[in-house]
């Protein structure tokens, strides 16, 4: 069954670059505890791609997910307008999905951008941030109490 593309649809050539970049980023994952490598690739409004991988720590709460690594890299270089992110893992039977913390961090930068959740065979599903985190809390909500 054909899947509807979100309104934030990304050009096919950008999607392919994102998917490849997320798979490449996964190779750099530092995950000695979970042995669950994840890679992410983030597409900015002007077409630049920032990649990231998960980085674990012996003090488990200090680890960081691939999605947040990519977003933090982009922010640290002055980018805040995002069009899409692709996420890769070694899960064979399911599409990799961002955790709740990553969904909230993505939400900080808008609700109508694409999240490509992949499998190693290259297949993917795409959802918007809004679809992954409905009824969310964002920066504009802070203005409602002033």
From Swiss-Prot:
<dbReference type="InterPro" id="IPR016192">
    <property type="entry name" value="APOBEC/CMP_deaminase_Zn-bd"/>
</dbReference>
<dbReference type="GO" id="GO:0006248">
    <property type="term" value="P:CMP catabolic process"/>
</dbReference>
<comment type="function">
    <text>This enzyme scavenges exogenous and endogenous cytidine and 2'-deoxycytidine for UMP synthesis.</text>
</comment>
<dbReference type="GO" id="GO:0006249">
    <property type="term" value="P:dCMP catabolic process"/>
</dbReference>
<dbReference type="GO" id="GO:0004126">
    <property type="term" value="F:cytidine deaminase activity"/>
</dbReference>
<comment type="subunit">
    <text>Homotetramer.</text>
</comment>
<dbReference type="GO" id="GO:0008270">
    <property type="term" value="F:zinc ion binding"/>
</dbReference>
<feature type="binding site">
    <location>
        <position position="65"/>
    </location>
    <ligand>
        <name>Zn(2+)</name>
    </ligand>
</feature>
<dbReference type="GO" id="GO:0071217">
    <property type="term" value="P:cellular response to external biotic stimulus"/>
</dbReference>
<feature type="binding site">
    <location>
        <position position="99"/>
    </location>
    <ligand>
        <name>Zn(2+)</name>
    </ligand>
</feature>
<keyword id="KW-0479">Metal-binding</keyword>
<dbReference type="InterPro" id="IPR050202">
    <property type="entry name" value="Cyt/Deoxycyt_deaminase"/>
</dbReference>
<comment type="similarity">
    <text>Belongs to the cytidine and deoxycytidylate deaminase family.</text>
</comment>
<dbReference type="GO" id="GO:0042803">
    <property type="term" value="F:protein homodimerization activity"/>
</dbReference>
<feature type="binding site">
    <location>
        <begin position="54"/>
        <end position="56"/>
    </location>
    <ligand>
        <name>substrate</name>
    </ligand>
</feature>
<dbReference type="GO" id="GO:0005829">
    <property type="term" value="C:cytosol"/>
</dbReference>
<keyword id="KW-0862">Zinc</keyword>
<keyword id="KW-0378">Hydrolase</keyword>
<dbReference type="GO" id="GO:0042802">
    <property type="term" value="F:identical protein binding"/>
</dbReference>
<dbReference type="GO" id="GO:0001882">
    <property type="term" value="F:nucleoside binding"/>
</dbReference>
<dbReference type="GO" id="GO:0030308">
    <property type="term" value="P:negative regulation of cell growth"/>
</dbReference>
<feature type="binding site">
    <location>
        <position position="102"/>
    </location>
    <ligand>
        <name>Zn(2+)</name>
    </ligand>
</feature>
<dbReference type="Pfam" id="PF00383">
    <property type="entry name" value="dCMP_cyt_deam_1"/>
</dbReference>
<dbReference type="GO" id="GO:0044206">
    <property type="term" value="P:UMP salvage"/>
</dbReference>
<dbReference type="GO" id="GO:0009972">
    <property type="term" value="P:cytidine deamination"/>
</dbReference>
<dbReference type="GO" id="GO:0046898">
    <property type="term" value="P:response to cycloheximide"/>
</dbReference>
<protein>
    <recommendedName>
        <fullName>Cytidine deaminase</fullName>
        <ecNumber>3.5.4.5</ecNumber>
    </recommendedName>
</protein>
<dbReference type="GO" id="GO:0019239">
    <property type="term" value="F:deaminase activity"/>
</dbReference>
<feature type="active site" description="Proton donor">
    <location>
        <position position="67"/>
    </location>
</feature>
<dbReference type="InterPro" id="IPR002125">
    <property type="entry name" value="CMP_dCMP_dom"/>
</dbReference>
<dbReference type="GO" id="GO:0045980">
    <property type="term" value="P:negative regulation of nucleotide metabolic process"/>
</dbReference>
<feature type="domain" description="CMP/dCMP-type deaminase">
    <location>
        <begin position="13"/>
        <end position="140"/>
    </location>
</feature>
<dbReference type="InterPro" id="IPR016193">
    <property type="entry name" value="Cytidine_deaminase-like"/>
</dbReference>
<dbReference type="InterPro" id="IPR006262">
    <property type="entry name" value="Cyt_deam_tetra"/>
</dbReference>
């Amino acid at each position: 069954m054909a899947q509807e593309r979100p309104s934030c649809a990304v050009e096919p050539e950008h999607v392919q670059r994102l998917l490849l970049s997320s798979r490449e980023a996964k190779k750099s994952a530092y995950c000695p505890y979970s042995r669950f490598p994840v890679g992410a690739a983030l597409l900015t409004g002007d077409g630049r791609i920032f990649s990231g991988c998960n980085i674990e720590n012996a003090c488990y709460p200090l680890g960081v997910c691939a999605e947040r690594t990519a977003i933090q890299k982009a922010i640290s270089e002055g980018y805040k307008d995002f069009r899409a992110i692709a996420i890769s893992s070694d899960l064979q039977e399911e599409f990799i999905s961002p955790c709740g913390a990553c969904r909230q961090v993505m939400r900080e930068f808008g609700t109508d951008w694409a999240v490509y959740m992949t499998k190693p065979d290259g297949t993917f599903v795409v959802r918007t941030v809004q679809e992954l985190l409905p009824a969310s809390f964002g920066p504009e909500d802070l203005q409602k109490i002033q």
